[in-house]
């Protein structure tokens, strides 16, 4: 799959923040009205000085894996809190270029709109791949929320500075919730409904859980 080269990645942290703020003005949290057909889940890992990006594409209705694409490359940027996308996107885009199946929506193991500058990896990536995106995170980055009920499917909203930025979703009874946020070109209802569709028997929804399992398997090779 091709992507739009929105900006370069070798810049100072100060310039990275400027880019985030500029792109944040262009985020569109709009309703995705169709039922997806094919969707992809993305997981990234950084063993030693390398980056590994895995894209798992699944049939939305059947919940079946139809493709696994990955890329490995050297990592040049250190981890900087709040600027993770600048470290992760280059390796993700290498995997994206190898992808031969076009997904309707792309899920990321990470944040979307629930970011200090509303520019988590899922949101940032959408400008390059020009696809609707959703972030599914295991933990909260920022914001305040009321704990959702203990039953599967119960949820509350995550807020930051009085703005709704995400969803705190219980994917299993009596298990810690996941933090879901729209990336771009979807709304909060889409992010909730499409994520919950993949909440089968595990805490982590299948769309990013499968990607993580393949990441762990590839790391052991």
Swiss-Prot record:
It catalyses: Endonucleolytic cleavage at apurinic or apyrimidinic sites to products with a 5'-phosphate. Mg(2+) binds at residues 43, 109. One of its GO terms (biological process) is DNA repair. It is an enzyme of class 3 (hydrolase). Its main location: cytoplasm. InterPro entries: Endonuclease-V, Endonuclease_V-like. The record marks 79 as: Interaction with target DNA. Its cofactor is Mg(2+). Its EC number is 3.1.21.7. One of its GO terms (cellular component) is cytoplasm. It is found in: Cytoplasm. GO terms for molecular function: deoxyribonuclease V activity; magnesium ion binding; RNA endonuclease activity, producing 5'-phosphomonoesters; single-stranded RNA binding. It comes from the Bacteria. Keywords: Cytoplasm, DNA damage, DNA repair, Endonuclease, Hydrolase, Magnesium, Metal-binding, Nuclease. DNA repair enzyme involved in the repair of deaminated bases. Selectively cleaves double-stranded DNA at the second phosphodiester bond 3' to a deoxyinosine leaving behind the intact lesion on the nicked DNA. Belongs to the endonuclease V family. This is Endonuclease V. The gene is nfi.
